[in-house]
């Protein structure tokens, strides 16, 4: 098997003051790609150890297709970060193996403090998490004590511990709308694009932390318009972590689960997809026969026309998954006090969703497609 390699990644790191940011650097360790024969052997050993260790595998839509398939065929879960944690909480397994990025493992631990939470690579992080350091976030909150603090799921446990509400991309609109009706002013973190989208849809008074997802931030509106002309029958599916100019070109705006459902149910032969291309595996399974095209990124540092894949999601592989099952290493720990505080904002969201009996809210420009979004879970 070839040797893994390290690559340096640039991302935007905002400061406390709204609008100020600098270029920061992080790294990702890309695992080697096993041969077909090695894949078979690795999967067989992983299946055996999951059963032997009384463990269950949960994987995000953005990780490698082999991991997604393995999670499903062994009775695990392939979903969004919150549903991964919910599934792990409700599953009888004593050990939960999370194939994703670190905040997902932390959320799983917060919801299941009594369980062992393992991850293939503890260094798999997120630019939204990195771009919202807890000390600066505390200072930001302290500077605006009159605002309700609402944070996106893509944050550390320590940031969640300071929040009044945690939201996912599918229920964020409803929660902010609820707070807006109550006359609340909101401090939002960390994704400026998702926050701006929700602000536009609800009219809420929102002060936005200026973070962004390095994958979604790279989608380009001009190139997307050109691609639409090349594929006139295609519908455009966009995650709201994308820039506003890209969202404006969408036929459907939504969370990962919502976009998969839209691909399955919308009457179109082709779809241009503006989110991490790891989702295409699930879309192709949900809508066989339809064609899926990566939305163009082509950023300044890009080496491909569309290279929309999170480098940290790519750190999850079959070999390091096997390694943690064999060794028990890479366990997620959350300080009990931080976990207790973070539970408050998560439970508040879950209680709100249960009371509403509606976990999603399509964007206003999708009123004609309301039926497509009934009964979809959070993402």
UniProtKB/Swiss-Prot annotation:
Its cofactor is [4Fe-4S] cluster. Catalyzes the condensation of iminoaspartate with dihydroxyacetone phosphate to form quinolinate. Transmembrane segments: none annotated. The keyword Membrane does not apply. It comes from Herminiimonas arsenicoxydans. One of its GO terms (molecular function) is quinolinate synthetase A activity. It is found in: Cytoplasm. Its EC number is 2.5.1.72. It is an enzyme of class 2 (transferase). The lineage of its organism: Bacteria, Pseudomonadati, Pseudomonadota, Betaproteobacteria, Burkholderiales. Keywords: 4Fe-4S, Cytoplasm, Iron, Iron-sulfur, Metal-binding, Pyridine nucleotide biosynthesis, Transferase. GO terms for cellular component: cytosol. It catalyses: iminosuccinate + dihydroxyacetone phosphate = quinolinate + phosphate + 2 H2O + H(+). It comes from the Bacteria. InterPro entries: NadA, NadA_sf, Quinolinate_synth_A_type1. Gene3D superfamilies: NadA-like (3.40.50.10800). Belongs to the quinolinate synthase family. Type 1 subfamily. Iminosuccinate binds at residues 60, 81, 152-154, 169, 239-241, 256. GO terms for biological process: 'de novo' NAD biosynthetic process from L-aspartate. Binds 1 [4Fe-4S] cluster per subunit. This is Quinolinate synthase. [4Fe-4S] cluster binds at residues 126, 213, 310.
